[in-house]
Amino acid sequence: MSWQTYVDDHLMCDIEDHEGHRLTAAAIVGHDGSVWAQSATFPQFKPEEMNGIMTDFNEPGHLAPTGLHLGGTKYMVIQGEAGAVIRGKKGSGGITIKKTGQALVCGIYEEPVTPGQCNMVVERLGDYLLEQGL
């Protein structure tokens, strides 16, 4: 299965609310910042933004004072799982990033999608990739 298929079928899929809602954008990005696959709506990001995210996984709390920046958008960092998941909030939307052995699984949402729904979609794929040794 191609990485794009994972994005299209497992991240940008209808959320299990039976109303046809889905994430706004999603991507799978290597730890080095290279994009493996992304939705057409995923923002262009700067290398330093991805470096900051990777630093926060290695040094939890690194992004808390400055916020998480991706594609020029600033998210307030909220509770996550140290070294495994970073969550951010901006207005009525937000972002979830799950770290696997080789990649970052990223999902961005806006209402009516909830933070919990985004977390479920992103972390389910991230956990699967971890189980596969990826």
UniProtKB/Swiss-Prot annotation:
Question: Which Pfam families does its entry note?
Answer: Profilin
How does this polypeptide assemble, per the annotation? Answer: Occurs in many kinds of cells as a complex with monomeric actin in a 1:1 ratio.
Q: What is this protein called?
A: Profilin-3
Identify the residue span(s) of motif Involved in PIP2 interaction.
Answer: 84-100
Give the matching Gene3D superfamilies: Dynein light chain 2a, cytoplasmic
Modification comment: Phosphorylated by MAP kinases.
Sites of Phosphothreonine modification? 114
Similarity remark: Belongs to the profilin family.
